[in-house]
Amino acid sequence: DDPLRVVRLVRLAAQLALEPDAETIALARATAPAAARVAQERVFAELKRIVAGDGVIASLALMDEIGLTESVLPELHALHGVEQNRYHHADVHTHTIEVLAQAIALQADPGAVFGAEHAAAIDALLAEPLADEVDRGFALRLGALLHDVAKPATLGRRGDGSPTFLGHDRAGAELARDVLTRLKASEKLKAHVAALTRHHLRLGFLVHETPLTRRALYRYLKASEPVEVDVTLLSVADRLATRGHKAQEAIAKHLDVAREVMPAALQWRAQGRRPPLVRGGELAAALELHNGPELGRLLGEIDEARFAGDVTTPEEAVAFAARLLEGD
């Protein structure tokens, strides 16, 4: 007997639009704990097909029903019953499934949020092969499932008893990496999903910096690359699935910022890294500096100023760096 069959049951039920009968469900429940002992690369091969499938939401519900989630994705199972603050309408697990549903809807029709003029570029990006025989669209779904995975571990309480999850983005990036390491995923997929988890809150922070400056936009893109487009999509899905106190106002503001960020993110990704206005050695010679953190900081400041349109030539870049040094 191969316990992997219970994972295949979930996949085939969705693929063939079948509803397992009571006897099959009972047998699956009895077998599900043994799935934890199956070679993880075999489990992941089936999970990839489940997550990529059209019926993934129903598949995840079936996995919960038969106890399979607890065996093969215990971190997802642990989200059940973890309450959130008043800005959420559901516990962490229900919210996570709704984020996945919103991500799937965005994947199917990005133009509904970002306009027809950007839909083709987003479609093309999500269709790009990534690693482990999956594309970026699959990775977005996986990121949706794992974006809040560290909330149980980071749960705290304010004085009034309301829950907090400070640092769940950073801790979640490590936990997402651990999950995918256990499943024998490639380093590239692990890094991609960890980055989605790590940066999924960034766009929400930008809402408090409106109207956006070019410098604020630069810092967002620089911090979140190479998932600057993907994580913008994930952030929108996350916001749309958060429907608690003052939700409509918050969603509207979030979408306004996302619509401003997305064209810049697409352009940033399409253009790639531009040759610097001035190289480190040239700047060091001009300002009589040694290689080190200070030189790196100045080069970063020049790059940000260039994005903002404040410097456009090598000479302006050197003069700008000199002014920064004088200010220090």
Predicted features and spans:
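Glycine- and charge-enriched loop/helix tracts that form the active or gating conduit
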Residues: 1-137, 141, 145, 149-167, ...
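Short amphipathic alpha-helical surface micro-motifs
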Residues: 42-43, 123, 177, 214-217, ...
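FIC/Doc superfamily catalytic core
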Residues: 60, 70-72, 106, 202, ...
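A generic structural signal for short, non-catalytic loop/turn and secondary-structure boundary residues
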Residues: 69, 92, 227-229, 271
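Histidine/acidic-rich helix-loop-helix segments that form or flank divalent-metal centers
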Residues: 82-88, 114-136, 185-249
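Alpha-helix capping/termination and helix-coil
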Residues: 103, 107-111, 144, 148-153, ...
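Short, low-complexity, polar/charged sequence segments that are solvent-exposed and flexible
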Residues: 162-164, 216, 253-254
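Terminal helices and disordered tails flanking the catalytic cores of nucleotide-processing hydrolases
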Residues: 203-210, 243-328
